[in-house]
Amino acid sequence: MSVYKYKAFKSGSKVSRLIIFLHGYNSCIEDVEPFAEMLLQHLDNTLVVMPEADTQSERNPLKKQWYALVDVDPDRKRRKPETPTDEIVEIYNRTGPRISETAKKMNAFISSLQKELKIKNKDTYVMGFSQGAMLAMYVGLTRKYELGGVFPFAGIVCGKDMLEKEHWVSKIVNFKNRKG
């Protein structure tokens, strides 16, 4: 049984590429479904899987979140234009243990799909919007083997202290210094 409830959208007759698309904070699968349809218009033999977070949103009981934010930013400073960037980064850094645990679950979910579909890491991509983008980046940085790509929309790398503790920061440096 899957760790997450999800919807899957397919193009072509044989799946040779897997895209995991992660919704944002205070969102759900239905909010991002149109993106799957747009992607599949341009990609053959692709399966787009949209898992839904398993935690109810703190802001809206009808929506979901990948991990809690209210207690690390009760005043919602991260949303205020006057908040300095370094303070916003620190707010998201405090989510490290939560995003780390969520990334472990997501990595297990992705690995189980890859095994079931016989899809390799190089043919697996993770996309996300907002909190889903942050999770996508963390997943990409913490997988044992490199993915085909990570495509974040409107997110930052968060949980820096946790990445350092888990020894993943060198992966970021190596990625930034890659040629080609």
Identify the role of each PLM range.
Residues 127-132, 136:
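Gly/Ala-rich beta-loop-alpha elbow adjacent to hydrolase catalytic centers
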Residues 138-149:
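Conserved hydrolase catalytic core segment
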Residues 20-22, 127, 178-180:
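Short hydrophobic segments within beta-strands
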Residues 7-10, 152-180:
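The feature captures the conserved acid-bearing segment of alpha/beta-hydrolase catalytic domains
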Residues 33-34, 62, 139-140, 163-165:
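Short amphipathic alpha-helical segments
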Residues 2-119, 123:
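Serine-hydrolase catalytic machinery in alpha/beta-hydrolase-like enzymes
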